Amino acid sequence: WIMGHMVNAIAQIDEFVSLGANSIETDVSFDKNANPEYTYHGIPCDCGRTCTKWEYFNTFLGGLRKATTPGDSKYHEKLVLVVFDLKTGSLYDNQAYDAGTKLAKSLLQNYWNKGNNGGRAYIVLSIPNLDHYKLITGFKETLTKEEHPELMDKVGYDFSGNDDIGDVAKAYKKAGVTGHVWQSDGITNCLLRGLDRVRKAVANRDSSNGYINKVYYWTVDKRASTRDALDAGVDGIMTNYPDVIADVLSESAYTAKFRIATYDDNPWETFKN
């Protein structure tokens, strides 16, 4: 999965997909009542990027729905996965459940079109704080209450705080999550980070009793660091330059081992080294 980083304006969806992304990451900020409000990152952000592009969250979902609904004039067949980077740092811990509830309602209405030919992309809810695991509970219970539990088949999870892998496993246990787990590791492109924790995550994925289904690394903009991440066995790379990742994937060293994921590739299925 080539994951376009910080895609917060509708116009950027076309831009990143045309550069080779089959997945995008979108920031979601919340108001003080735990309503998802904007797709917005803010300053500071990655080096070389404009930090302040934004839409209202529900407006963005409408654009995203069009981009992922077959038959729509804005449809992109290859856009198959969306990571919502949920900026829950502005919320109190006890608001996490409400945030999950409100997020589910927004997606149901504006993305899934109440289950009637809505957007088809797989969704990853990426949460920065292990203490906010109840966001997952709120999300799940709301879709059940709204009589669309089947949509959970399209939803996966990520805790993005670079926490100890054992602590992440405990948070999933509390949330009752037993699959659909993506594990992120990384840092802003302005700084360097080694691959030690990525290797631990890959080892967990490849073990017989691990909780991780897929591992992705962020934010990778250079060919050398792309090769290092691929050599470590990641499933996804988040980048500001999808064309760089696509270029490296076309090198002879990688064409035999990797290919770009399509809609038929189940993102919750573990593919071991």
UniProtKB/Swiss-Prot annotation:
Cofactor requirements of the protein: Mg(2+)
GO CC, any one term: extracellular region
GO MF annotations, alphabetized: lyase activity; metal ion binding; phosphoric diester hydrolase activity; toxin activity
Transcription regulation listed as a keyword: no
Alphabetical list of InterPro entries matching this protein: PLC-like_Pdiesterase_TIM-brl
Entry comment describing in which tissues the protein is expressed: Expressed by the venom gland.
The UniProt record lists the keyword Aminoacyl-tRNA synthetase: no
Binding site for Mg(2+): 25, 27, 85
Catalysed reactions, semicolon-separated: an N-(acyl)-sphingosylphosphocholine = an N-(acyl)-sphingosyl-1,3-cyclic phosphate + choline; an N-(acyl)-sphingosylphosphoethanolamine = an N-(acyl)-sphingosyl-1,3-cyclic phosphate + ethanolamine; a 1-acyl-sn-glycero-3-phosphocholine = a 1-acyl-sn-glycero-2,3-cyclic phosphate + choline; a 1-acyl-sn-glycero-3-phosphoethanolamine = a 1-acyl-sn-glycero-2,3-cyclic phosphate + ethanolamine
Domain of life: Eukaryota
Disulphides: 45-51, 47-190
UniProt-listed SUPFAM superfamilies: PLC-like phosphodiesterases (SSF51695)
Subcellular location: Secreted
Listed EC numbers: 4.6.1.-
Active-site residues, as the UniProt record annotates them: 5, 41
Keywords: Cytolysis, Dermonecrotic toxin, Disulfide bond, Hemolysis, Lipid degradation, Lipid metabolism, Lyase, Magnesium, Metal-binding, Secreted, Toxin
GO terms classed as biological process: killing of cells of another organism; lipid catabolic process
Co-factor binding comment: Binds 1 Mg(2+) ion per subunit.
Task of the protein: Dermonecrotic toxins cleave the phosphodiester linkage between the phosphate and headgroup of certain phospholipids (sphingolipid and lysolipid substrates), forming an alcohol (often choline) and a cyclic phosphate. This toxin acts on sphingomyelin (SM). It may also act on ceramide phosphoethanolamine (CPE), lysophosphatidylcholine (LPC) and lysophosphatidylethanolamine (LPE), but not on lysophosphatidylserine (LPS), and lysophosphatidylglycerol (LPG). It acts by transphosphatidylation, releasing exclusively cyclic phosphate products as second products.
Family: Belongs to the arthropod phospholipase D family. Class II subfamily.
Name of the protein in its database record: Dermonecrotic toxin LsaSicTox-alphaIB1bi
